[in-house]
Amino acid sequence: MRHEELLTKTFQGPAVVCGTPTSHVYMFKNGSGDSGDSSEEESHRVVLRPRGKERHKSGVHQPPQAGAGDVVLLQRELAQEDSLNKLALQYGCKVADIKKVNNFIREQDLYALKSVKIPVRNHGILMETHKELKPLLSPSSETTVTVELPEADRAGAGTGAQAGQLMGFFKGIDQDIERAVQSEIFLHESYCMDTSHQPLLPAPPKTPMDGADCGIQWWNAVFIMLLIGIVLPVFYLVYFKIQASGETPNSLNTTVIPNGSMAMGTVPGQAPRLAVAVPAVTSADSQFSQTTQAGS
């Protein structure tokens, strides 16, 4: 039965629509149901918060409403050692909440600010104990004080500040030059002291042969080339010419014949020999023997 009753109900539009600069509120009337209906059928209030481009268009950040957890934003000056994790642990909030409130994309965006917004509970212990947390200044409560100096005083102050900056700059340059000169003098003195204590090394001996030419002069090289290229070949040709012209075609050879004639004989490779005829002489013994034989 309960399910059938819910199906028979028709959609009921909002009776009242309230518009605000940052949100829209829709008011619904109670239906003619039983007293035991759920809280969904009761009147409720819907608050839509701007997101994305609408938040940037509004220009002014509105703190959360009291019904959304009673959270307020307090401002804290950043120190050099602060980080998102440290702030979250110190004030009992989430890192995501701090990044969301301050529009951080990365954790490094924290170091670009001088102060950060911390979401804390309204009327909580943190608001009473932590004195470094300060409430945010609204644009209406901020007061700007502008002090205008006369033109002469302003010009004098500007020139005095510029002169002081220039003097400090030039003094720094002079100090750097003095330090460089002193360090150079110290290095020069230490080098001179080191070289004075070291013994002088003997000069290396010069080698007589230098390079591929063995240390000879250019005219010596020219003379050697002429001797090898011209004189030796000419001497070689002349020597073989003389040897070829000195040999005779035939050699004479002479032998002695016993009957007193002379004969010439040629033997290849030997000098010619001459043979002279010698008359035969018989001794007295041979004649005596011949006469005795005839008398007998």
Curated annotation (Swiss-Prot):
**Organism's domain of life?**
Eukaryota
Task: Return the SMART domains for the record.
Answer: LysM (SM00257)
The way this protein sits in the membrane is described as: Single-pass membrane protein
Q: Which keywords label this protein? A: Glycoprotein, Membrane, Transmembrane, Transmembrane helix
Region ranges (Disordered): 29-67
**Which residue ranges are assigned to the Cytoplasmic compartment in the record's topology?**
239-296
Q: Where are the transmembrane segments?
A: 218-238
Mark out the compositionally biased spans (Basic residues): 46-59
- Carries keyword Transmembrane helix? yes
Location(s), subcellular: Membrane
Q: Which residues lie on this side of the membrane: Extracellular?
A: 1-217
Q: Which residues are glycosylated?
A: 30
Outline the extent of the LysM domain.
Answer: 74-118
Q: Is Membrane among this UniProt entry's keywords?
A: yes
- PANTHER family attached to this UniProt entry: AND PUTATIVE PEPTIDOGLYCAN-BINDING DOMAIN-CONTAINING PROTEIN 4-RELATED, LYSM AND PUTATIVE PEPTIDOGLYCAN-BINDING DOMAIN-CONTAINING PROTEIN
Q: What is this protein called?
A: LysM and putative peptidoglycan-binding domain-containing protein 4
Q: Which organism is it from?
A: Homo sapiens (Human)
Which gene specifies this protein's sequence? LYSMD4
